[in-house]
Each structure stands twice: as C-alpha cells, then as structure tokens.
C-alpha cells in the first residue's frame, strides 16, 4: 500500500471491540471493512448467531412468547441464516443445537434493565460504541452484563495452570470489561459479574468482576488502537476457514480472490 498514510481516517474513527478484533484477526480485513468501507456479504456462522440474538431480543422485548421461539426458529431458519453453507452434518448440528436451547429455554436470572442496549463511551481519548445484549439487576441492585455467544465456551477450570479454554474465556471477557466502562460512566458503579449465555452448548458462565482485568482490558484497547494508528501496511492473515466462512469482505479481498483462482486451476 506504499507510503500512503491512513492515519487521518483512523484518527476520526469511533471504536468498538469488534473493530479492534477485526484488526487483530486480519489487518487487511480491517482495511477493507473500515477504511475502504466495503459492505459485508452474509455468512452462515455470523447470521446464525445474529438469528438467535434476534429471537432472544424479541422475547425480552415482549414481541415473542417463550412457546413461540422454537417454532419461529424452525420456520425462519432458511430465510434468516444466509451465506455459503458448510457441509450438511454441520448445518444439522447447528439446527439441533438451536432446537435444544430453545426447547429448554429459561429466562436469565436477573431483572432486565435493557436488551441490546446501545452504549457510547470513552476509553482514554478514544470514542467507543457497543451493544450490550442484556443488562440485568439482582434484588440487591447489583448489575450484570450478559453476552449471548454462539461460541462453545467453558466455565473456568480454576486449575493452577490455565487451560486453553481458560485463555479463550479471558480473551472473550475483554469485550465485557470494555462494555463495563460504559456502565461505570452511565451508572457510576461497576457490574457485579460478567456472564456468557453460550446458546449452542447450553452453558451459562458467570465470572465475578475483576478490577485488575478491567484495567488490563482498557489498556489492551488503548494499546491496540495505537498499534492500528501506526500501521502502514495492512497485511492479510490467510487462513482458509476464516477467509471462506467467516470474513464478510472476502469477495473484495485480492488475496482470497487469487487463492480461489489458484484452487480452480488445480
């Protein structure tokens, strides 16, 4: 990309956890999506997650009854879950997981303050925006952030040496710690706990709020943005599954286009 600096565009950005993670996953995807501003195409896995999110949002807003959720899931699956399908056994596994979750669905154990709550806040000198899936409160006035996840996370093992799943959980928790900045700025208090509703495996994870991890997550966000600001060459991180099934801008990616043409030639 030569000596052209995109810093003026980056300096004007409003940040989010997903924007930072796009860069960490593939700098070139960040470039295509947030600098070139290409529209994303539908992908199976992301649209599946969005569909479940939508069903839960409609339930908590009173637009969908509990007994209607499973029927709506089955009737609208083909319309709502779009993009290139993986192999049929994988599609069926996702359908079965959705059915299992909705058949045994239980509302969250905290009174709802808001669902899909839009938050605008600041970390250091940087503007942020986010959407909290569910903000709840218990009988003592403690706040809880709940994030709906299609990823199959596991509760913390509490082993002396963290497991791979523990490290994955800590990585995912950064998002909720960043959202906690918005809660502190709006309500003047921090959440009591951060929770993941893992709807594919039916696991509900509750993590007590850790102030050290909170500060570390804020610093991670600032350091990540500074790294992006200093980036001149947004290089691609090529990985077939992610490029083909996850990346929403792969139709505009010269590296993915070249790779597909190479596969066709062979």
PLM features: residue spans?
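Nuclease catalytic cores
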Residues: 20-62, 116, 249
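A residue-level signal for conserved active-site and pocket-lining positions in enzyme catalytic cores
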Residues: 26, 52-53, 134, 179, ...
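A short beta-strand motif that forms part of the nucleic acid-binding face
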Residues: 36, 149-152, 198-200, 211
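Hydrophobic (often cysteine-bearing) scaffold residues that line and stabilize catalytic clefts
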Residues: 44, 48, 94, 172-175, ...
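A non-catalytic, helix-rich entry segment at domain boundaries
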Residues: 54-117
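Metal-dependent nuclease catalytic regions and adjoining charged, substrate-binding loops involved
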Residues: 78, 82, 169, 173, ...
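Non-catalytic protein-protein interaction segments used by genome-maintenance enzymes to assemble
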Residues: 117-176, 180
